[in-house]
Every structure is written in C-alpha cells, then in structure tokens.
Amino acid sequence: MERIAVSPDGAGFVLVESRRPFHPWGMNYGNKGRLMEDFWDQDWQTFADDFRELKALGANVVRVHLQYGKFMSGPDKPNPQALTQLARLLRLAEATGIYLDITGLGSYRPADVPAWYDAMDEPARWAAQARFWEAVAEVCRSSTAVFCYDLLNEPISPGGKREAGQWRSGHLFGGYDFVHHIALDPAGRKREDIAVAWIRQLSGAIRKHDQEHLITVGLLPWSRQWKHLSGFLPSSVAPELDFLSVHIYPDAKKPDEAMECLRQFAAGKPVVIEETFPLSCGVVELETFMRASREIACGWIGHYDGDTLAELDALKEAKRLTAPQAVYREWLRLFVRLQPDFAR
C-alpha cells in the first residue's frame, strides 16, 4: 500500500509513489450496533470477516472510532492491550488493502467514560487528549494503511458557559452520544479561536511521532437554521488541517440544503463527506446529492453495521427484513453501484 498525500493542486488526494489520484470511498465501521472495542478482544474473526466484506463491496477506506475510555487507563496511562489491538488492526488493514480513517477520543457510550476524564478542567482534559493521540500516533506512524487521523467526532466549541463535567451533548442516538464539547467556558474567547488552539495542541501531539499521515476533524454540518453550530468555522480551521471532513445527511424535506451546506466547506482544502446515509431521505435523493457533491467533495464515507448484502438479500427473500435492515440494504446496493464512478 502506498501512503496517501494531498494532491499538488490541493483539491484532492494522491498515492505518493505512483502519483495516481485517490478518492476515499468507504464506510464508518460498526457491527450490530456495537462499538468495535465491545467485541474485538473476544471475537476478532467477526472483525476480520467484516473488513474482507467491506473490501469486497468496493470500499478503500474504513473509518474506525477509538473510544477514549478503552484506550486510556488514566490521564497519562495508555492501555497497552488496546494499543496491541490497534496494531493488530493496522496489520489487518494492510493485509486486506483497506486504508483507515482513525477517529479518536470517542466517548460515545456515557457509561464507558471514566469519571476522572469528565471531572477534568479544560487544560487537563486537552493534555489528556494529547496524550491519547501521542500513544496512537506512536503505534500508527509506520503503517501505510493509515489514511488519516480524525481528532474527534463532531466537536463543538461552546458559545456559552456549560455546567461542570458536561462535555457531551446529552442527546443520545441509538444509545450513543456522538457530539462532544472541547471547552465548557469560552471565558471571553472567540469560539473559532478555541477550536484553532485545540486543533494545534492535538495535532502537535501527533506530529511528535508522525509527521506524514494526514490530520482532519469530523465536523458537524452547516444548516440554514443554525449556520455553523459547532463553532468550527471552515475558514478558520482549514489552515490547521490537511483536509476538511463534514457529516451531511440529506433531508428529503430540504432538497437543496445538503449542497448548500457542502459549499460552506469549500475553503481551499480537499473536502471529504465523512458521514452520509439515507437517514432522512431515500436512496434516490441521496444519489442525487452524492453525484452533485463531486463539484466540491473528493471522498465519501457511509455506514456499515455488520450485515452483508447477501445476508440482507436472503432476509428480504424470506420476508424477514426489518425496516432498518431495508435501509442498509438499499444503501449497500447504492454503494456498490456508484463505486466505479466515485472510487476511480
């Protein structure tokens, strides 16, 4: 596998040695609603089988979500067992020919978040987050399977003071909280300045060990109602990142908003749609958006939850397909059909 870099024109990606263009085309990884750390110690075979299935579907990138509480035993104590499994994951990705979008600092399941982590003040928390990324980068630095490091999924730089310990959004989706605040009190600072300072500290931690692999952040979308709700303004954070990642789920009731959102992220760096799915629309609307998105985006990552297309087809034939499974089936069929055009 060749290392991936930003293309000379700054609009996309290339494979470093061959200089061939690279278009990320893949999935956010999950299995039956589980986080990978829930089962990868006891059932690695399922994990490995899923990667082979994703490769067969045409994916060249898989986004994996590392949970902070599983990777850190204390503020300055990485968990060696988790790092061993991460190294094993890198070998699996290399053997399978799949690149990894390594997203860190996950606190998705509130019950798994260490009490000491939530009790920290901002400087201590940022330092603990930097230590996490140092440990991860030290393991990953020599692997050609790393596409990028995503510092945190859907961070928010707060617009006002929050209660002590309220780092997460408090809004669960499927039992998980995917949105995290990087500070609890702006204390007179601009939201975008907090975001830039946080990115610099965590990127610096990675660069202590890995000067080559790309760095990004998985950003919440712009909307007509809320604008840039996250406080991570593309114009401010783009200079600090190798490329921009945005999460866009088209809404059938607002057919033009998805592209309007995407245009807000055209800030002089490559743009990857790091999450998308027919969550609030059908596959026809999603395909329309994805095809239009090529005006700006150069990579697309959807969702996978462990059911193969063959398994879903069999369930449909047996008339035992649930509504959520039907949505996944339609998405996987679209993913396979679009792959030749999008991952070229």
Question: What name fits each language-model region?
Answer:
Residues E2-F243, K253, T276, S280-F289, ...:
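Active-site mouth of glycoside hydrolases
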Residues H247, I301-Y304:
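His/Asp/Glu-enriched short active-site or ligand-binding loop at hydrolase and phosphoryl-transfer sites
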Residues A252-M259:
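Substrate-binding surface in catalytic domains of secreted glycosidases
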Residues E260-V271, E285-E295:
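Surface-exposed substrate-engagement region within the catalytic domains
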Residues Y304-R344:
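Aromatic- and carboxylate-lined catalytic core of secreted/periplasmic carbohydrate-active enzymes
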